A protein has these predicted regions:
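Short aromatic/hydrophobic "clamp" motif used to bind/position activated sugar donors
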Residues: 98
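A conserved acidic beta->alpha catalytic loop
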Residues: 49-58, 78, 102
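Conserved donor NDP-sugar-binding/catalytic core segment of glycosyltransferases
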Residues: 111-146
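Glycine-rich, basic loop-to-helix element that forms the pyrophosphate-binding segment
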Residues: 76-93
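Catalytic core of nucleotide-sugar-dependent glycosyltransferases
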Residues: 160, 203-204, 227-235, 240-270, ...
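Conserved nucleotide-sugar donor-binding catalytic segment
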Residues: 148-244
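N-proximal low-complexity "stem/linker" segments adjacent to membrane-targeting elements
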Residues: 1-33
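Short, acidic, metal-binding catalytic loop of nucleotide-sugar glycosyltransferases
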Residues: 32-42
């Protein structure tokens, strides 16, 4: 269901697209931070609500009645998950440029849109621009981290080499969707060309993949070294699971998703080995801390279900060898003993 007024602004240059689900506590602050942007150009705010049942829809309707000239609502009949919610909302947006904002984040400055759009308007070779942000603890309000610097090959190259940098995490932090603005036409072309990534979102959580791959293949990334957005850190989120095993499987899903991307784009065996070697080292470190080496080995071996060839089998053999996992097992046991002793001493 789409709720929009006939008074909705005509020909917006940029659309702020907000994806939300059961975030009634935060959504008004998010929406208002977008509606109150001070811009010399027309803009709209499009909210995609993914089947909320916590009173969020009623709140959004009241806001839409008050700000009918700028606010458009899209209510999904059922929960579609984050990626498909964004795809649907962006398709309904009318702006040349799309700025995305998660339902619990918000803009810190009134000219965030002006700064983001200015980069795209004046740099045709840039497909996506993102800015700095700070993360804060939702319970205490304490600022946890301030990020106003971004270094990556993605600033200078496009195409396969840019995607390689993306998949290898070749940057100091992942581009934050809530501080990003990009060209709508490139995104929609990517949704057709790389539709497999949308389908994979039903299996692996990684809503930024279809966006970042599409943008990296078509242009360079831009960056604004200023705090534009506040990123809220919650106790529970899509990344939060009841057990450490569930959490590890979730994290390892990103490794599998990267392999799917590499296969889809016909990466060379050397590129695939580079991606997997880097990401598996990260997962091994996670497994050590959580004492989940057996699960790590099982997940690494499951990569054959995606692609079974000489390269993958070599990667599996090298990353599950005794020389790799034995030191990890020992460290994992030491971490567990240390954690146990801490609990005993607290009592």
């Amino acid at each position: 269901m789409i709720i929009a007024s006939s008074q909705l602004v005509a020909n917006p240059l940029v659309s702020v697209v907000i994806a939300t689900y059961n975030q009634v506590k935060y959504i008004e602050q998010t929406v208002m931070s977008a509606l109150t942007q001070q811009c010399p150009f027309p803009f709209e705010v499009v909210v995609g609500d993914d089947g909320s049942n916590d009173g969020e829809r009623e709140l959004l309707k009241r806001l839409q009645e008050k700000y009918s000239e700028k606010l458009k609502l899209i209510f999904n009949d059922k929960n579609m998950m984050v990626t498909r919610n964004y795809v649907t909302a962006i398709h309904e947006a009318r702006g040349k440029y799309i700025a995305t904002l998660d339902g619990d984040d918000y803009y810190l400055v009134k000219d965030a849109l002006v700064k983001l759009v200015d980069v795209l308007e004046n740099n045709e070779d840039i497909s996506l621009v993102h800015g700095g942000f700070h993360s804060f603890d939702n319970k205490t309000g304490k600022v946890l981290n301030i990020s106003t610097k971004w270094e990556s090959p993605m600033l200078y190259v496009k195409g396969i080499n840019s995607v390689l940098a993306l998949l290898c995490n070749d940057f100091n932090n992942y581009p934050l969707g809530s501080s990003s603005c990009f060209r709508k036409n490139i995104y929609e072309e990517g949704c057709i060309k790389y539709k497999k990534l949308i389908d994979l979102s039903d299996k692996y959580i990684g809503e930024g993949t279809i966006l970042n791959v599409s943008m990296a293949m078509s242009g360079k990334f831009g960056y604004i070294p200023e705090e534009l957005t506040a990123y809220r850190v919650l106790d529970s989120s899509l990344c939060h699971y009841k057990s450490k095993e569930e959490s590890f499987r979730y994290s390892f899903g990103y490794v599998k998703l990267r392999l799917h991307v590499a296969e889809m784009l016909d990466f060379t065996p050397t590129m695939i080995k580079t991606i997997l070697s880097k990401t598996l080292k990260q997962e091994l470190n996670r497994a050590k801390v959580s004492n989940l080496i057996n699960l790590y080995i099982k997940e690494v071996k499951s990569l054959k279900e995606i692609k079974n060839d000489v390269v993958i089998n070599t990667v599996i053999r090298e990353n599950t060898s005794l020389s790799v996992v034995l030191p990890a097992r020992i460290l994992g046991c030491l971490y567990s003993i240390k954690s146990f002793l801490k609990k005993i001493l607290k009592k």
